[in-house]
Amino acid sequence: MSTQSVSSHNIESSSFSANQHAAEPSVATGGIISEIVYNADQPIVTHLLLPLLQQLGTQSRWLLWLSPQQRLSRPWVQQSGLPLDKMVQLHHINPLFTVDAMERALLTGNYSAVLCWLPHELTEEEKVRLRHAAQAGNTYGFIMRPESAGDDAYRLFPSLKIHSTLYH
């Protein structure tokens, strides 16, 4: 894995094991899934999420970006202060299998955070699967979903769902 570029990575061929991270201190225990519904014209989400990702980047584990539609910009990653040598991106995946890929990644325990861009809401069954996988892998999972016209009927304002065991 080169420290000079954002790397592609095969989830199933990772050489790390979940047990390597058991003794490592973590930001949260048990893993968690949060959904961020965003408006592409409002960069506030970036400002909210970056400090957490920077903190998670100090762990020995990877940061995984599942973004089927686009690639991460290397200059943006460098400018944002995220560790290039711990960034992994999968962008050549079928959008239909993105949730399955996220579940497998969360289960491995190899990632501090898994960010996943989805064009639609998750089913209840998918939410349960991801929640269990995040807890099993002690991993943060962020589901990034763009605001759609249908969301306007239910929301007066853009929303951010932040779930934390620190506040409950």
UniProtKB/Swiss-Prot annotation:
Q: Where does the record place the region Disordered?
A: 1-20
Instruction: State the conditions that upregulate or repress this gene.
Output: By DNA damage, as part of the SOS response.
- Entry comment on modification after translation: Is rapidly cleaved and degraded by the Lon protease once DNA damage is repaired.
What InterPro entries has UniProt attached to this entry? Cell_div_suppressor_SulA, P-loop_NTPase, SulA_CellDiv_inhibitor, SulA_enterobact
Q: Positions of the region Lon protease binding? A: 161-168
One of this protein's Pfam families, by short name? Answer: SulA
Q: Which SUPFAM superfamilies match?
A: P-loop containing nucleoside triphosphate hydrolases
Disulphide connectivity of cysteines: none
Give residue numbers for the site Essential for degradation by Lon protease: H168
* Keyword tags: Cell cycle, Cell division, DNA damage, Septation, SOS response
Please indicate if the UniProt record lists Chaperone as a keyword.
Answer: no
Q: Tell me the Gene3D superfamilies matching this sequence.
A: P-loop containing nucleotide triphosphate hydrolases
Q: What residue spans carry the region label FtsZ binding?
A: 105-111
Does this entry carry the keyword Cell division?
Answer: yes
Question: One of this protein's GO BP terms?
Answer: DNA repair
Protein purpose: Component of the SOS system and an inhibitor of cell division. Accumulation of SulA causes rapid cessation of cell division and the appearance of long, non-septate filaments. In the presence of GTP, binds a polymerization-competent form of FtsZ in a 1:1 ratio, thus inhibiting FtsZ polymerization and therefore preventing it from participating in the assembly of the Z ring. This mechanism prevents the premature segregation of damaged DNA to daughter cells during cell division.
Q: Which family does it belong to?
A: Belongs to the SulA family.
Listed under subunit, the entry gives: Interacts with FtsZ.
Name of the molecule in the record: Cell division inhibitor SulA
The organism of origin for this protein? Pectobacterium atrosepticum (strain SCRI 1043 / ATCC BAA-672)
